[in-house]
Amino acid sequence: LGLITDGRTLTQWNKIQALGLTAFIQQEDILVSEAFGYGKPAPQVYRFFEVKYPDCAYYYIGDNVTKDFVTANERGWTTVCLLDDGRNIHRQDMEVAKEFQPRYRVQKLSQVCSIID
């Protein structure tokens, strides 16, 4: 399990700690764009996991159609969009070009389990 997050390092780590995500994700598998040097949709962030974990099935779960899915789609990852329930900070416009579209859409994170092989 890995995490790709865009933003300032301190801000994103405060969020990660507040959510208790390090109980589920190893710290070295958390990429914060400012510290890593690249953000989404740069291919380097996706390649990091492909190199570290070769010969795996890759799933990308996100909510920002403008940058979350385009590179993951290009790289053959299975993409899943967690649909906005009214709390997103950015507009979730699904009327984007096909390459920006997720393969799947879910209302709840628990629904992802039925997608993963």
Write out the residue ranges for each language-model feature.
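Asp-based, Mg2+/Mn2+-dependent phosphohydrolase catalytic module
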Residues: I4-D117
